[in-house]
Amino acid sequence: MQKATGATALQPSHMLSVAVLISGYTFAVCYFRLFIFPHIPVLPGGDQLGFATQGARIISGQLPYRDYFQIVPPGTDLVYAFLLRAFGVWTWIPGLVMACLAATVAVLVTLVSGHVMQGSDVALPGLLIAGFVLFSSLDATHHWFSTVLAMAAMMVLLDGNSNRHLAGAGALCGLAACFTQTKGALVLAAFVAYIIWQSRQTQVPGESWRKCLLLCAAAATIFGLANAYFVFAAGIRQWLYCVIVFPLLYYPGPGLNNWRVVGQELAADGPIWRWIPFPLLYAIPLVYVVFFLHLRNNRKRDPTQNWDKLLLIALTGTAMFLAVASSPSVKRLSTVSPPAMILLIWLLGRFGRTAAKLKIVLGVGAIAVAVAGSIRAQTRSWSFLDLPAGRTAFKDVAEYDEYRWVLGHTHPGQFFFGMPLYFPFRMRDPAAIEGLDSSEYTRPEQVAALVQALEEHQVPLLILGVSKKYPLDTTSPRLAPFRDYLFQKYRLIKTFATGNECWARIGSWQIGSSVNRDYDQLSRATP
């Protein structure tokens, strides 16, 4: 263990206590940023709304790949479906899920740190996650679910490589792949590399193949069992297209899904404090490079370090990073950062007093950022609406006005097209897709199916996103059928301050109807 620091190793019971404390702290930080005390949720946003909406589609009898489009395995959809079935469709669900995911990551990170660090250092990676990593990544999507499972699998291998440990780690990799297929597969590959490396150190090369086979068999079994029903329902060809072919060929089309996202985020408008997590997150690959160089130069010179466990952490983290390397947005980097935070603190303890002081600065800074963010969320001005999915807090006035208008002009259960309004208003998407894009991400057959669904269900209202997200004026031929249908069957009735446009179906929308009069009364009664 890390004797050079002069710190003492924590007893297992003390280690667990520290992990629970860091977890509780992380949960509180997230809760006070995502809820207005005591229990009013801030309007959820981001990709989590898509998964929550798909969970609602499952409990209504629909299935991914067959009835709606999905490019990842169904793990996240199923979690939301279970929660919505148990508690109902409420806007507090995504926020509470995110707080629980963050708390779980904090526990795992702290316990992993206890394998390779001593003293107060074991708490620092968890503090970095609560302060810097979660700063702009409170989005409960498949990325966080698969990270929790990948970290849990790594924990199992850190405790040993017996058949029981290998089967458990493999099963968790298979489960991680049920949320993010690339992360689960790459982490499994990292474990295989680790086992082969270990066997070469122990001079038992033949044993490694048996262990690798057990590991991979456990992963494949869990993944196969979890996905079999959906493969059967949609057909193997459709499942392969959605989960493998589409992500490889068409997912990188939008700038958000490729390397251009880095430039977009750096050039985006926003408050200066949005830059706080950028240096730490963009340094993730550098952390791994420095560690591997340090490993090569010092492994034989310093036998006091547990290099096997450190290598496993580094290989796992590198695999997780590679899963998002083609589209390294801040949110995605945040979800794969936990192993890097552990190695960063460990490395800082190896490079002299100045680096050791930097650990203190990072820890204090992380606490300050986390606490300040929570206080800011609780003390700023909020607007509130009683949406069909529950009372919800709004920080953006333009967004509040748009949602208030929609509240007065729609009703739960109606067909409607336009993310992200399905979930908070409990409305139904008539199509297999949730939106359109000018890139190759939107396929011609999806556009044709959307037009058919709008006509079949006579959808009364569409809310189309701002121009940078919704390419209404594009010359892309794949969107021409929708554009022609829109201009023929709908008319623009309102442009919101957000830039979003509301289109009403000609003949099915009467200005001055009862729902409009109800909204007018609501507008006068609501400050």
Over which residues does each language-model region extend?
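Extracytoplasmic catalytic/substrate-binding loops of multi-pass membrane glycan-assembly enzymes
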Residues: 38-54, 65-79, 89, 234, ...
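Transmembrane-helix motifs of polytopic, lipid-linked glycan transferases
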Residues: 96-117, 152
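Short acidic/glycine- and proline-prone juxtamembrane loop motifs at membrane-interface regions
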Residues: 137-147
